C-alpha cells in the first residue's frame, strides 16, 4: 500500500473490500444488495472489472462510507458535500 505522507493510499479495490468487511458483509451479500452476481462483484474487487457509478453509490450507501472517498480515495473537505 502506498502512502501520502503518513496517510496510506488505498486502491479502489482496497476501499471497496475494507468498506464491505467493516459493514460485516461477504462478497455474495454485497453483490445481492447492489444487484449483481457474486462472481461479477469479486472481479470488481480484484480489479478485473471497473465498477459502474451506480454500484459505487450503492456500496457507499450500504456501508455508510462517503461516495467521493470510495470512488477517489480523497476525503472531502468540511462543507464540500
Locations of the language-model features?
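A short, Lys/Arg-rich alpha-helix, primarily the initiator
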Residues: 1-22
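Residue-level signal for the short linker/turn that defines the boundary of a DNA-recognition helix
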Residues: 14, 24-25, 51-54
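Short, charged recognition helix plus adjacent turn
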Residues: 1-8, 61, 68-81
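Alpha-helical residues within the helix-turn-helix
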Residues: 21, 32, 61
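Conserved hydrophobic/aromatic packing and binding residues within compact polymer-binding modules
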Residues: 16, 30-31, 41-44, 70
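Recognition helix of helix-turn-helix/homeodomain-like DNA-binding domains
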Residues: 35-51
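DNA major-groove recognition helix of helix-turn-helix/homeodomain DNA-binding modules
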Residues: 35, 52-69
Amino acid at each position: 500500500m502506498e502512502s501520502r505522507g503518513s496517510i496510506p493510499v488505498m486502491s479502489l479495490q482496497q476501499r471497496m473490500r475494507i468498506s464491505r468487511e467493516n459493514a460485516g458483509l461477504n462478497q455474495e451479500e454485497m453483490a445481492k444488495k447492489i444487484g449483481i452476481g457474486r462472481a461479477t462483484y469479486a472481479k470488481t474487487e480484484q480489479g478485473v472489472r471497473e465498477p459502474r457509478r451506480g454500484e459505487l453509490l450503492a456500496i457507499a450507501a450500504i456501508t455508510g462510507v462517503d461516495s467521493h472517498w470510495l470512488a477517489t480515495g480523497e476525503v472531502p473537505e468540511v462543507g464540500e458535500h
